[in-house]
Amino acid sequence: MSRPPLPPFDAVAAAQKARMAEDAWNSRDPAKVALAYTEDSRWRNRAEFITGRAGIEAFLTRKWARELDYRLIKEVWAFAANHIAVRFAYEWHDDSGQWFRSYGNENWEFDDEGLMAVRHASINDLPITEADRLFHWPPGRRPDDHPGLSDLGL
């Protein structure tokens, strides 16, 4: 299964890949998201190590059961050959109603078919009030006219 754009990445392809990942994650559909990764993809997400699509699906199912009303924005930081680095922020609340903005960086490595083979994510959670939220679009894809991270001063 091929998942264009394929490496080596230029600036346009890297931005497209980041937006595709953002859109998939904003769908909050673990099975759909997992298809962007190799069968044996290796992840480090915070302090958790995950291997393979089944592990990714299980992880994302747990994540989105806990991180409610999730909204994510990604932005390319750097790219070279088959690697892309992104920074991101996402907003969510827990089951008590406490809102958070989570900030992070991801390093991605892709195979020749454009599937992500390696993902390293470092993430920090900042408690915020509901009034501090910046991501207000309806569930799903961020609208094209919604500001990105740099536009929001994040």
Please place each PLM-identified region on the residue numbering.
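A beta-strand edge to alpha-helix "cap/lid" segment located at domain peripheries
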Residues: 1-9, 58-154
